[in-house]
Amino acid sequence: VRGYQAIKRFKQWEGDKSKLHRKIENARVGFQNQRTRFIMDFKEKFWNNVDDFLHRGQRTWTEWRDHLVKRILGLGNAKTSFGLEMAFPNECEVTCMDTHLFQFYGLDQTKDAKHYKAIEADWLKQCEAKRVPSYIARCIYWDKNQNKRNSRYWSYCLEK
């Protein structure tokens, strides 16, 4: 959350790598060199081909997510899925299988990463059977796991 809050005002650092680096460093989230490089790389790719990031075309959700993972340095399946979930909460057919959901399946995310797509497929199937969007089900599970009544403890950072 601190890292996002530090850089969310794009116009304050747009095109200025050293200013972006300072903002990330001051947020004290670590890995400022890599984060700066990854964010600058994403900025260039995004603004050079916006449609590639906003429209999946004929791709399945999984194909689109996998395509984006290859294009966005520093993001894997979970964080890319999270972005898609937030952008398309009701129709998204990929889900952020974070450490908590790996634990739900009795797995360790570090050791069992190869099972990501299998547990994601199961999660999506279970959600579809219950007629609940997977993102909504995941948010409910995550909030409950964090002993929170709702997602406001982190989502406030997306406002203003």
Each PLM stretch: what is its role?
Residues 1-2, 15, 47, 109, ...:
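Short alpha-helix boundary/capping elements
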Residues 23-47:
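Extracellular-facing segments of soluble proteins and assemblies that are Gly/Ser/Thr-biased and enriched
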Residues 35-43, 51-160:
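C-terminal accessory module of base-excision DNA glycosylases/AP lyases that mediates lesion recognition
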Residues 1-31:
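Structure-specific DNA junction-binding interface
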